Every structure is written in structure tokens, then in C-alpha cells.
Curated annotation (Swiss-Prot):
Family, as annotated: Belongs to the RuBisCO small chain family.
Entry GO terms, CC: chloroplast
GO terms under biological process: photorespiration; reductive pentose-phosphate cycle
Name this polypeptide is given: Ribulose bisphosphate carboxylase small subunit, chloroplastic
Record function comment: RuBisCO catalyzes two reactions: the carboxylation of D-ribulose 1,5-bisphosphate, the primary event in carbon dioxide fixation, as well as the oxidative fragmentation of the pentose substrate. Both reactions occur simultaneously and in competition at the same active site. Although the small subunit is not catalytic it is essential for maximal activity.
GO function term, MF aspect, one: ribulose-bisphosphate carboxylase activity
Subcellular location: Plastid, Chloroplast
Organism listed in the record: Cucumis sativus
Alphabetical list of HAMAP family matching this protein: RuBisCO_S_bact
Other facts noted in the record for this chain: The basic functional RuBisCO is composed of a large chain homodimer in a 'head-to-tail' conformation. In form I RuBisCO this homodimer is arranged in a barrel-like tetramer with the small subunits forming a tetrameric 'cap' on each end of the 'barrel'.
Subunit description: Heterohexadecamer of 8 large and 8 small subunits.
Gene: RBCS
Length: 189
């Protein structure tokens, strides 16, 4: 009997507290119906009056699929001279990265042949020319290795990567040599 009295008193206290709490919180009035406001609207279906994020549309040409192949980040630039290669290698060494010379006898660019998943590309990993040049302090040593690789594989693409052995990531990569066969392939593609 006492439990039933206690429970009904508890329900009564909850019911009496509910209206007080509801009156303390203001009702949400952020969204209002526009049905009550008379609006005169003209039926204009001209697409030029639609809202836009730009004044005029600028069309940009995409990368042409024939004749111009992209290899690395700045591969659209002309081939680098030995002086420019030396400056790039100096930059690489100045940042404390380990130079590594790599070559690819194939096409020299990434492609999909063995797997069709979006993140997988064949041709991303090239063959190392020799071991990474740990302890290299002069860009002329890197240029000498590039020249040796060109003599050994004249029809191969040669690139230099800069490896940060502390973070264990590749920080820079650039094409040091493109074979003359590329000119022929570009003209027939």
C-alpha cells in the first residue's frame, strides 16, 4: 500500500515539474512557413537568371591524351641541363635526403595492367640503379651515377628520388633523362 502511494506521488511530482520545464525553454522559431505571406512570382524559365557562383563560365582544356605523356610532377617542362640537374641534386642534399637513381626500361609512366582497383598502379616502382647513395655530399657524384646509368641503358627513363631516412618517405622525385625513343612514341600516339 505504501509503495502504491509513493509511486503515485512520484508521478504527480513529475507531472507537476513538466509544465514548469516546458515554460522555461523557448520554442524553436527558426523555420517559418512562407505559406502565409503573399508573394508575386513571375514564371521565368530563362536559365541565365538562375543563381550562379561565377559571372562567366571559363572552359579549361584538359590534358591531351595523344602525344604528351606525363611522368612526374614537373614533367611538362623541358629536359633539364646538367647544371639544372646539379642544382636539383644540391637541393636534395641540402635538405638531408638520400639520393637514389632509378631506371625504367618500359614506358616510364604509371599505368594499370595487372589490377583495376583505383589506388593501384603498375609502373610506379622503378628498378634501382645501385644502392641508395647514403653519405653522398656532392651533386657531382649523383650526376656521375646518372651518366653511368645512361651509358648502360640508353633506352631507359632515369629518375632521381630523394629519400628521407628519418621519416622513411620519398620527398622528391624528378626525371633526369628521357630516351630518344620517347620522341618517336609521342609522335605516333
Amino acid at each position: 500500500m505504501a509503495s502504491s502511494i509513493l509511486s503515485s506521488a512520484a508521478v504527480a511530482s513529475v507531472n507537476s515539474a513538466s509544465p514548469a520545464q516546458a515554460s522555461m525553454v523557448a520554442p524553436f522559431t527558426g523555420l517559418k512557413s512562407s505559406a502565409g505571406f503573399p508573394i508575386t512570382r513571375k514564371n521565368n524559365v530563362d536559365i541565365t537568371t538562375l543563381a550562379s557562383n561565377a559571372g562567366k563560365v571559363q572552359c579549361m582544356k584538359v590534358w591531351p591524351p595523344l602525344g604528351l605523356r606525363k611522368f612526374e610532377t614537373l614533367s611538362y617542362l623541358p629536359d633539364m641541363s646538367n647544371e639544372q640537374l646539379s642544382k636539383e641534386c644540391d637541393y636534395l642534399l641540402r635538405n638531408g635526403w638520400v639520393p637514389c637513381v632509378e631506371f625504367d626500361i618500359g614506358s616510364g609512366f604509371v599505368y594499370r595492367e595487372n589490377h583495376r582497383s583505383p589506388g593501384f598502379y603498375d609502373g610506379r616502382y622503378w628498378t634501382m640503379w645501385k644502392l641508395p647513395m647514403f653519405g653522398c655530399t656532392d651533386s657531382s657524384q649523383v650526376i656521375q651515377e646518372i651518366e653511368e646509368a645512361k651509358k648502360e641503358y640508353p633506352d631507359a627513363f632515369i629518375r632521381v628520388i630523394g629519400f628521407d631516412n628519418v621519416r622513411q618517405v620519398q620527398c622528391i622525385s624528378f626525371i633526369a633523362y628521357k630516351p630518344q625513343v620517347l620522341l618517336f612514341l609521342s609522335s605516333i600516339c
